[in-house]
Amino acid sequence: MIDSLESKITFEIPNNLDFNKFIRENNYSSFWQNLHQQETAARVAAMSSLGMGVSEPLRTSEYNASDFNLLSSLQNFAGRAGPVGFSADGSEQLLDPTYERFIGDVWVGIVLTLMILSSIFCMCSCFLYHKFRQWQRSVLTARSQTLSSMDLETPPPYDVESLPSYTIVSGLPSYNDAIEQLKQKQQQKSPGGHLEPVKLQRPSVIKLFESQSQDLLAGAKLEEIRYNFANNLTTSVVSENSFDVTPTTSSNTAVNATTVAVAPNFKTQVSTSMPKKFTVCNYSVENERSGS
């Protein structure tokens, strides 16, 4: 009859409600203390049965990583999400020390990276400033050598420590320095040492593009020679309907006209103007018809 009985083992799987009820009734701290007290009592009883003494540090054991993992899995299974450090009901929440150590290492790495970058930036800034000062000293040295080669007794009237201007970079003196150099050269060349300096005037850009043809031809006296190609060798007859192109001369210019008769068979009159003082040549063409 006993053999006819079947042996059965029943296991009931707990659900979330059971875990929530268990966690609400017993908070983490009390549950943790009870768990370690039971483990400590079991160890003390085992060691006492073997006849070994129990030390005080064994009675007060500390938390380890497996305990934290167990509590974290229980909390995740129960679905109780709360802020860091405290649970939803206000009880203290236990954190994994490995995670805290990892966060601390991350912050230390960030701070060290920022310090290294700032030191590299300072080194680059100092290097660029050193190169700038070296370039400035080389430019000033070249400038002083240029001035000494020109046999000048006095230094130029500008501050040596000032930033280089376009005259220092190009190696050319400024306008005032050029005038002073010209005066000194003239005084050195003169026998008495006292010579009136020449007055220099800057050229105007606008005057370079102005037309000066009227000013050049104003005081000139032009001679005009007309070549008359007609049938008559002595006189020239111009009809009333003839087309005349006058020479382009100034109104203030005095012109002497001379008519020269050449061989017949030509009916075109050419007028040229030859200047006395300037190489200006003007041409005028007249078409004439022979009279009947």
Swiss-Prot record:
Task: Provide the transmembrane region boundaries.
Answer: 102-122
Any one annotated GO CC term:
plasma membrane
As for subcellular location, the record says:
Cell membrane
Supply the alphabetized keyword list.
Cell membrane, Membrane, Transmembrane, Transmembrane helix
Membrane topology of the entry:
Single-pass membrane protein
Any one Gene Ontology biological process term? axon guidance
Q: What happens when the gene is disrupted?
A: RNAi-mediated knockdown results in thinning or even complete loss of commissural axons in embryonic nerve cords.
Q: Report whether Hydrolase shows up as a keyword of the record.
A: no
Q: Does the keyword Transmembrane apply?
A: yes
Which stretch carries the motif PY-motif 1?
163-166
Protein family per UniProt: Belongs to the commissureless family.
Q: What does this protein do?
A: Essential for nerve cord development. Functions downstream of fra to control axon guidance across the central nervous system (CNS) midline.
Q: What is this protein called?
A: Protein commissureless 2 homolog
- Naturally occurring in which organism (per UniProt): Aedes aegypti (Yellowfever mosquito)
As recorded in Swiss-Prot or TrEMBL, the protein's gene is named comm2
